[in-house]
Amino acid sequence: MAEIVPLRVQLIAKTDFIAPPDIDWSTDADGGPALVEFAGRACYQSWSKPNPRTATNESYLRHVIEVGHLSVLEHASATFYITGISRSCTHELIRHRHFSYSQLSQRFVPEDDSNVVLPPAVEDDPELVALVRKATDASRAAYVELLEKLESTLADVPNAVLRRKQARQAARSVLPNATETRIVVTGNYRAWRHFIAMRASEHADVEIRRLAIACLRQLADLAPSIFGDFDIATLADGTEVAISPLVYEG
């Protein structure tokens, strides 16, 4: 029986910032937020902070987001390693073209002991969970049987690596969308804001909405001056959404 696994989102990389020693400027932030402020001030050479209303990193970046000068957000990035996510969810995730992805390959990694990610709609109903388990176990059994027969059929292929790859890429066609996958995702701050705005909405599928909110929580800790305008709320059905009054890109 396949193991049911929960979503796990781990921040594994973030932007560092090294201030040029010849620029007479300092800020009260570091990392990505400092880099974004530096990029914005570089546009106007406003190193002396002439406007007291934007003298802090937080107030400066708030102004940047309010006026839509979002290109400076593209200099800083964050990378997550995401596990416990279904193949159907990553099919939606990879539509965000400004992210960079490295995903588990079903052509090279055997799926005979793959895990399963439950659709959120069935999680609290034992009968529905049992039906999903039954269906996914049957699919995996078909995968194993098909893989064995394909490897036998392709036995005359001299290259063992190629033979296994050809067998797996054909056998994977019977695996369900609920199969767990694992993926590394890198995005700049602007791309992450857009992803959260689109996918943490109540109109998004619940699984990818959970992913967006899990990313938001870590991004808000990493760069509160960039992501702190998003508020997380709980809907009547118990699921969460995130909204911001400063989202202008659709």
Curated annotation (Swiss-Prot):
The UniProt record lists the ThyX domain at: 7-233
Where does this protein hold dUMP? E92, L93, I94, R95, Q103, L104, S105, Q106, R107, R172, R199
User: What name does the UniProt record give this protein?
Assistant: Flavin-dependent thymidylate synthase
Pathway connected to this protein:
Pyrimidine metabolism; dTTP biosynthesis
The record's keywords, sorted A to Z, are: FAD, Flavoprotein, Methyltransferase, NADP, Nucleotide biosynthesis, Transferase
Q: Which Pfam families match?
A: Thy1
**Keyword Flavoprotein in record:** yes
What this protein needs as a cofactor is:
FAD
Tell me the classification of the organism that encodes this protein.
Answer: Bacteria, Bacillati, Actinomycetota, Actinomycetes, Mycobacteriales
Q: Mind telling me which CDD domains this protein's record contains? A: ThyX
* Gene behind the chain: thyX
Report the EC number(s), separated by commas if there are several: 2.1.1.148
- Claim: 4Fe-4S is one of the keywords in the record: no
Which residues of this protein are catalytic? Answer: R199
Report motif location: ThyX motif.
Answer: 95-105
Oligomer status and interactors: Homotetramer.
- Gene Ontology MF terms in the entry: flavin adenine dinucleotide binding; NADPH binding; thymidylate synthase (FAD) activity; thymidylate synthase activity
Family label: Belongs to the thymidylate synthase ThyX family.
Textual note on the cofactor: Binds 4 FAD per tetramer. Each FAD binding site is formed by three monomers.
Q: Spell out the HAMAP family in the cross-references.
A: ThyX
SUPFAM superfamilies (alphabetical): Thymidylate synthase-complementing protein Thy1
Instruction: Provide the function of this protein.
Output: Catalyzes the reductive methylation of 2'-deoxyuridine-5'-monophosphate (dUMP) to 2'-deoxythymidine-5'-monophosphate (dTMP) while utilizing 5,10-methylenetetrahydrofolate (mTHF) as the methyl donor, and NADPH and FADH(2) as the reductant.
Top-level division of the source organism's lineage: Bacteria
Q: Which residues bind FAD?
A: S71, R95, H96, R97, Q103, N188, Y189, R190, H194
Q: Which GO terms describe its biological process?
A: dTMP biosynthetic process; dTTP biosynthetic process; methylation
Q: Which reaction does it catalyse?
A: dUMP + (6R)-5,10-methylene-5,6,7,8-tetrahydrofolate + NADPH + H(+) = dTMP + (6S)-5,6,7,8-tetrahydrofolate + NADP(+)
